[in-house]
Amino acid sequence: MSEHFILQPGQLSLLSIKQILDEELSCVLAENAFELIRASHQTVKKVIDEKKTVYGINTGFGSLANQTISSDCLKELQRNIVLSHACGTGKLLPDDVVALILLLKINNLSQGYSGVRLELINALIALFNHKVYPCIPSKGSVGASGDLVPLAHLSLPLLGEGEVRHQGQVISAEEGLKLAGLKPLELEAKEGLALLNGLQVSTALALSALFISETLFETAIISGSLSVDAASGSDVPFDDRIHQIRGHQAQISAARMYRNLLAGSQIRESHRYCNRVQDPYSLRCQPQIMGAVLHQMEFVGQTLQVEANAISDNPLVFAEQGDILSGGNFHGEIIAMAADNLALALSEIGGSAERRIALLIDKNFSGLPAFLVRESGLNSGFMIAHVTAASCASDNKALAHPHSVDSLPTSANQEDHVSMATSAARRLHEMIDNTSTILAIELLAACQGLEFHKPLKTSPQLDKIYQSVRSVVKEYDKDRYFAPDIEKIKKKILDKEFSLLTLTN
């Protein structure tokens, strides 16, 4: 595998983004981008040479847009916008998210609509390639006029200001620039604004959440299948004929996943002709629930792939026509709505899993010992593990409230409608932590349920999952310290050990 990738500006796919980040590939900008970048920069220079007044080049910003700035102050203007806008707060964004922000910003500026120099783009590439990640506080953006505050923090080190993180250590920007083979840059006209305008932070946060959510989706299909077998559930509701006549492709696909996972289960065959007619909805309706989740995730993926390549700067430079146009591509409404949809999906993944845990521990529904432990009363078993799952599911319901319906005017009402895209995307990561906790508890509960069916075994596919769980967590024959077991399984989930692809290998 090549250790670098050639970035063709505007042509990132979700697959290529995953590959770049997972394999830690370095970036080389395609040479066919050079002339577009130069032409765009020359268009900006021409505005200055001809003493025209154009927003963002020789004016103030936001509600100060009517203030004209003299030519001898333009470099100071660009430095000032970075310094004044770097006022974020909160925990620092993790390195993998900052790497993705850098990648998206490089992709954005390299398409030749921002008027910046190639030298500036190469500096961002050097930071990316040397894994020198600007320290970016997580809070401060409202997702309109772009992610101004966090992108200002991204830009600070280019000026020799602020701090960066390298190999997990926070160091000064000056040290970081040396590691990347750089010296502090003096920004030219429009460059500060081009760095700050854009939706790369909200897009990166949403993409990062989407990639992890895909793993959680697969884990939920697996844990839900295990719960069906542990609770002596039926595989009839997964019959393809049922789903074909409804017609939703995602539901059809989800049902196929359940059929494939449950095929060959000795437990299922042992009660195929029992008197139980129908299972509770949390078992029976899984293809309908998870099909809807998959449908939402596919929509979110399509939206974010477009946004990963989108130009969200302002003003925009159209070098071929010599025009510089002001618009509103920096408004993150579509990202906010996509993040809200993903939040609904995550809430449903966790919420339905919590219901299955509740079913498994209830002897009246599952037919298993109360709270999945022998000598219940002396032992509490999974009683309080379910309470933890319920707590996380309830948190997710509150966190799933749509952020895109919220708006607070800023910049003296010049920016009077904002998207809240960044907070919409940021909250997804808290939901991911909650959902992975719930799924870890379901996996533990379902595997414990299988113990009571021995010597009968689950399907060959699901037995691989059972063995993986048992490799780090033994059977619960009596009460013990529970929290470490949950964390062990959460780690396996987030390390993608419970994926459908893994089962096919």
From Swiss-Prot:
InterPro entries reported for this sequence: Aromatic_Lyase, Fumarase/histidase_N, HutH, L-Aspartase-like, Phe/His_NH3-lyase_AS
Gene3D superfamilies named in the record: Fumarase/aspartase (Central domain), Fumarase/aspartase (N-terminal domain)
A molecular-function term among this protein's GO annotations: histidine ammonia-lyase activity
Enzyme class per UniProt: lyase
CC per GO annotation: cytoplasm
Main location: cytoplasm
EC number: 4.3.1.3
Disulphide bridges, residue numbers: none
Post-translational modification: Contains an active site 4-methylidene-imidazol-5-one (MIO), which is formed autocatalytically by cyclization and dehydration of residues Ala-Ser-Gly.
Pathway named in the protein's UniProt entry: Amino-acid degradation; L-histidine degradation into L-glutamate; N-formimidoyl-L-glutamate from L-histidine: step 1/3
Keywords noted in UniProt: Cytoplasm, Histidine metabolism, Lyase
Localization terms from the record: Cytoplasm
GO biological process: L-histidine catabolic process to glutamate and formamide; L-histidine catabolic process to glutamate and formate
Sequence positions bearing 2,3-didehydroalanine (Ser): S145
Cross-link annotation 5-imidazolinone (Ala-Gly), location: A144-G146
Catalysed reaction equations from the record: L-histidine = trans-urocanate + NH4(+)
HAMAP family, per database record: His_ammonia_lyase
Entry's family note: Belongs to the PAL/histidase family.
Protein name listed in UniProt: Histidine ammonia-lyase
Lineage: Bacteria, Pseudomonadati, Pseudomonadota, Gammaproteobacteria, Legionellales
